[in-house]
Amino acid sequence: MAQSGRRGDPEEIFEILVTSFSRGSGRAAAEGDLCWRPATDVFETETEFVVQMDLAGLDPARIQVEFDGDALTVRGIRSEPAAPGRKHYHTMEIDVGPFVRRVPVIAGVDAASAQARYRGGFLFVNFRKGEDRPGRRRQIAIDR
């Protein structure tokens, strides 16, 4: 939600700040950037643990997916779409700039089975259920 050039009334700005602080673990601020956090669903099926993120408008090449043994971290950058001429915003709700989202992963998943794919503006990361095999930190390639 933090964007340069955004204007709003003081109550709205205060709400954005409070929401930003209460949502995160402080990790994004520690990395030096004000980051937005994509909407995320986490669910399981009979055979898999699935993390689904709303990352509409992103180039998958600008998304990094990493698993560090107990959490999945997704980070990247969404650029503002170019528009001809000068823009005068009436409403500005689409987050742009850097983002980071850390999602705890339940015990009982096979870390080595992690697969990521980007389809229709959503990132899906699937882990097979099974024997709890904690994995070392590793990058997960995104199937496009």
Regions flagged by a language model, labelled:
Residues R78, A82-R102:
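An anionic, turn-rich surface loop/hairpin at beta-sheet edges
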Residues F49-L55, V125-F127:
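Short, well-ordered beta-strand segments enriched in hydrophobic/aromatic residues
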Residues M1-Q52, T73-R75, S79-P84, A141-R144:
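N-terminal leader/pre-domain low-complexity segments
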Residues D59-Q64, P104-P134:
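Beta-rich strand-turn-strand
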Residues E131-R144:
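Intrinsically disordered, low-complexity terminal tails
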Residues R37, V100, R137:
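Short coil/loop residues immediately preceding or within conserved phosphate-binding loops
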Residues D59-K87:
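Core FKBP-type peptidyl-prolyl cis-trans isomerase
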